[in-house]
Every structure is written in C-alpha cells, then in structure tokens.
C-alpha cells in the first residue's frame, strides 16, 4: 500500500538528528544521529522489514485466517493463498476496509486521525519485524551443548552496542507510543496494529555484569520455578485484549447499522449494502482473528476472555437452542463449530498433493482454537467453584476435541514430522506452529485435570477412570514427546532440503530453522519450556533407579528429548530475550 511503501522515508526522517545520548527507554524521533540513520538504510530498509513481516505473519495468516474456515464467513468461495507466492492480504484488506467504512459512514475520522492510525500500523509492523534483526552477536552465535552463560561480559557489551538491538528498542518504543496516542480511536487499522504489536515481545534491557545476579546451575527440583520466574517477566496480553474489544465494537456497530439501528441518515443502510463482498468478508476475517487471539491469550495467561461466548456466536450456531442446564448457554460446541458429526470418514495421509496437505493443515487451525477455548472454560469453572458434574461436562467435551484431533490432524502431522525433509516449506511452517500450539493447550489441560483430581473436585467415578487409564500422565508424555520431535525437525536449517521450483524465497533471517517463522513466540516459549522441564524432571527421577537394566537407555533418551526442546528455545532466542534466558537456564540444568 502507499502508506507502507513510504515507510523508509518516514523512518529516515525520524532517525535523523543529534547524538544518541538518551536512554533507549526514552527514545525520541530525533535522538538517533546520522550514523544510525545511514546504518539503518544500509542494514534494515523498509523493504526488509516488510519482507520479514510478509514471510512470517502473513505467511501464517493465510493458514490461520482462511475464508474456508472462518466461522463468521458466509461466502467461502475465495481462493486461498497457499502457493509459493502470497500477498500481504490481511494488511492490505485492513487498510482498504478503513477507507470503505469511512465512505459508508461507519467510521468518522479526521485527516489527522487517519494519519495517526496509519502511523500506528506502520510502526507495529516495524516493531514486529525487527525482532528478526540478525546483526547481533547472539544472532550470529551457533548452537553448542556447552553454554557460554548469559552474562558473558564481552557478549553483553557487544549486545549493548549492536545496532539491531537499538532498532528493536527504538521501534518497540515508537509503536508503543503511537498506539497510546490512538487508544481512543476505533478503526480497523488501529485494531490490526494492536494485534500485530501484541506479538512483538518487548526487548529486554541487557544487564551489566555488576547488576546481574550470580548465574548458578539450578537444581532439578528448582528448575520448574526458575523457568516460571523467567516467563512471569512477560506482562499481560494488553494489546490483544484491546484489539479484541475494539474489533468487537466495530463489528457491533456494523451489525447494528446493517439492521438500521443507530443510523444518522436513512441512506446509510444502502451504503453498507453496497459494500463489496470482499470488504464485508474482511470484517468477518478480522473479527475471527481477534477472537482467536483473545481465546488463546486468555487461557494462556489465565485471564477472562474479552468477548464472551454469547457475544461471539458463530454463524451456524445462531439457530441452536440454548441448553437449560448450564450457565454458558452459548458455549462453543465442537461438532457445530467444526461442522462435523465427529465421525471421521476420511483422514489425510502423507504423502499427498500440496493442496490436500494445505487444506488439512488449514482446517486444523480452528480445532486448536477450540481446545484453547475449552481450557478457558475449565479455568473459569474452577474459579467459580462449579459443581463436580459441571466440571466433568467440560472435561468430557474437551476430550471429544482431543480425540477428534488424534484421529485426524494429529496422525497427519506425525507423518509430516517423519518425512519432514520432503514436506513443502509453507506446509512445514504452518503445521509446526499449529501443532506446538495444540500441545501447549494439552499440557495446560493436563495440569487442570491434575488439580481437579488431586483436590477431589470432580466426580469420583470419572476420577477413578482417569487414574486407571493413567490419562493425565499419558496426555503429558505424548505431548512432550511430540514437542521434542517438533523441536528436532523445526531447528533444521531450511537449506538442507532440496528446493523445488515452487519453493518460496524466505528472508534469510528465518531460514536457520522452520521454528523462526513462528509469529507468536510466546506460545512456543511456553510449550518447549514445559516439555524441557518434563524431560529434565524425568531424568532426575530415573537417577533414583540406576540399578534397573533400562536406566541408561531411558536416561539418555530423556536428556536427548530435553535437548531437542532446549535447542528450539535457543533458536527462538535469536529473536526473543526470554527464550534466550530460558535456553541458557535449561542448558545449565541439562549439564
């Protein structure tokens, strides 16, 4: 778009100024000198930032937010962008939707407000993309089983001087400020900017050797709490919550105007009706994206969803009669949501055609969201001290989703892992990320079930059945092992595969491993951290049974599986300070 094509010029004017003497937390548009400005044009141009955004976020949004799977979509005839070439679809359609909404009098924006919204979106894209800046010492370092420790003084000094780190702090600070300036402005560009910025982890300020705490090898008993303390440094999902609330407000306004409510002119209804089909569909796609982010973030951070079930009922659910024996009459039902009877008449098997594989992976995305939504139901029911039969009802429906996954997408994904080198690059990125998200939700579910059974909160019969089947232990072990397998293949450099004629040319910043194409880093951090701790604790437990014949084999296997997960975190650490610290801590525990 024109607004984004001028990003380089705008940033050029921002970074040109006097000497860079202020703290990074208080950067102003004129606080970076000519040296930095020149280096910016040499190392990190506007086209590079947009290329990274395109190769990471839009690459995944073409799978996550498809017309064929959007529950708020009526027309499903759009051609999916599954090929080796794709556009910045969501970005372009968001910008267009704001223009169309203004012409239909759905939005009232002054010229200065339009400029502020566009600026916020540009800066959110830049803040997101600079996470993949590859000039720092840390980004160039190769993986080794011998940790150098996170507080190596030389590395810290270099990190503080590295230009890419300056860019990360600068753009995060500028995007944060720009979004604060438009906090009261309801439009689609602001909501989209908030969604994008919610994925940009705030760069941490490096600690000097004198300020940083002594780095000691944690014991096996303390590693879980040590990992949790690092993860807790991440703040609440404020921007995804703001985006969900804003997107819900905009959809509420559109639905009201479409029915003739709140119109300031009788001619407005005709304006909405004359909106192009694609633009009306964009409203549904963006709303689904916001609900998806809200659902995953709410369960992951143990917070209430912004948009309740009753407020975000999907199209095919509107005619469903509410149940009379539940406090959540509009709870998402998996058979209705997925438009399936639960019976699996056909399962995709690998090898298969590219389109068939892409369709299967795309259809798995809503199943993942549905599981996170049910994890949230269980969290809320426990907070409310719901009756045992209500808890078991949620558990039963959640396990239906789990079983459905294992009979369909789960089996297909295992086959993709086994033949990973022959899987097309875009399919790799899609299924690796969705699968890792799924397994994090399963691990969260296992923790909740453990809490229910340990505290005798559910029904005795159901508790005894879970105990007899070792269900909770199986949930944890299966998901952790699959995460280990994912960590192994997702850290293989993409250049090891034989490229086909239709292989996309990804930006070099994401070619060191498929895992680097993940846009929502926090999900993978939590998933691989939990799996790492699981295997390290298992290895520690095996030490108590050294006399058994299978000790050596099982012990080595546990350590190898832990290392697969730690390496995944280490590679994520090239763009995430949190992942870097976790990889260092877990690697110390591994030794």
For every predicted segment, state its role.
Residues 328-431:
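Long, internal scaffold/assembly segments composed of regular secondary structure
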Residues 121, 189, 279-282, 286, ...:
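Structural signature of alpha-solenoid helical repeat junctions
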Residues 77-112, 256-281, 336-355, 413-427, ...:
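Acidic, Ser/Thr- and Gly/Pro-rich intrinsically disordered linkers and low-complexity segments
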Residues 413-431, 442-591:
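Fungal C-terminal regulatory tails
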Residues 3-177, 183:
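Transcriptional activation interfaces
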Residues 127-352, 417-418:
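Acidic, Ser/Thr-rich, low-complexity intrinsically disordered regions in fungal proteins
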């Amino acid at each position: 778009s024109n607004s984004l094509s001028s990003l380089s010029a705008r940033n050029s004017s921002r970074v040109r100024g006097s000497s860079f003497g202020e703290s990074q937390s208080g950067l102003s548009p004129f606080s970076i000198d000519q040296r930095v400005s020149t280096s910016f044009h040499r190392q990190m141009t506007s086209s590079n930032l947009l290329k990274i955004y395109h190769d990471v976020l839009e690459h995944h949004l073409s799978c996550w937010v498809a017309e064929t799977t959007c529950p708020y979509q009526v027309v499903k005839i759009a051609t999916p962008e599954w090929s080796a070439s794709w556009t910045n679809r969501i970005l372009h359609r968001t910008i267009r939707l704001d223009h169309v909404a203004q012409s239909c009098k759905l939005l009232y924006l002054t010229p200065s407000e339009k400029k502020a919204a566009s600026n916020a979106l540009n800066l959110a894209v830049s803040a997101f993309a600079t996470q993949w800046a590859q000039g720092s010492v840390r980004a160039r370092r190769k993986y080794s089983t011998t940790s150098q420790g996170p507080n190596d003084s030389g590395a810290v000094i270099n990190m503080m001087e590295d230009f890419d780190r300056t860019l990360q702090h600068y753009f995060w600070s500028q995007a944060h400020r720009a979004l604060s300036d438009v906090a009261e402005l309801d439009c689609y560009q602001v909501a989209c900017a908030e969604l994008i910025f919610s994925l940009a982890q705030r760069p941490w300020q490096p600690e000097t050797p004198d300020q940083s705490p002594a780095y000691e090898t944690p014991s096996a008993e303390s590693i879980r709490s040590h990992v949790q303390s690092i993860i807790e440094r991440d703040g609440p999902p404020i921007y995804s919550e703001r985006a969900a609330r804003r997107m819900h407000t905009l959809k509420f306004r559109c639905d009201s105007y479409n029915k003739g409510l709140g119109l300031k002119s009788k001619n407005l209804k005709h304006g909405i009706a004359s909106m192009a089909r694609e633009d009306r569909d964009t409203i549904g796609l963006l709303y689904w994206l916001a609900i998806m982010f809200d659902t995953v973030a709410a369960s992951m951070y143990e917070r209430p969803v912004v948009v309740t079930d009753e407020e975000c009922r999907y199209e095919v659910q509107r005619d469903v009669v509410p149940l009379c024996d539940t406090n959540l009459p509009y709870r998402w039902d998996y058979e209705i949501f997925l438009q399936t009877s639960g019976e699996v008449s056909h399962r995709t098997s690998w090898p298969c055609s590219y389109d068939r594989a892409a369709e299967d992976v795309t259809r798995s995305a809503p199943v993942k969201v549905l599981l996170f939504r049910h994890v949230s139901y269980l969290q809320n029911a426990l907070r409310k001290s719901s009756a045992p039969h209500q808890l078991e009802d949620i558990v039963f429906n959640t396990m239906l989703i789990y079983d459905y996954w294992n009979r369909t997408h789960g089996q297909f994904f295992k086959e993709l892992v086994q033949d990973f080198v022959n899987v097309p690059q875009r399919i790799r990125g899609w299924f690796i990320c969705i699968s890792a998200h799924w397994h994090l939700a399963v691990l969260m579910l296992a923790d909740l079930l453990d809490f229910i059974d340990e505290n005798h909160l559910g029904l005795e019969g159901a508790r005894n059945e879970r105990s007899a089947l070792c269900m909770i232990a199986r949930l944890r072990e299966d998901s952790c092992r699959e995460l280990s397998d994912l960590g192994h293949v997702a850290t293989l450099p993409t250049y090891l595969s034989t490229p086909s004629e239709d292989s996309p040319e990804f930006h070099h910043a994401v070619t060191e491993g498929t895992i680097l194409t993940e846009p929502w880093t926090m999900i993978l951090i939590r998933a691989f951290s939990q799996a790492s701790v699981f295997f390290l604790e298992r290895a520690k437990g095996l030490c108590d049974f050294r006399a058994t014949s299978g000790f050596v084999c099982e012990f080595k296997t546990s350590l190898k599986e832990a290392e697969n997960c730690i390496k995944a975190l280490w590679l994520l650490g090239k763009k995430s300070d949190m992942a870097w610290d976790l990889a260092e801590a877990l690697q110390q525990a591994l030794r």
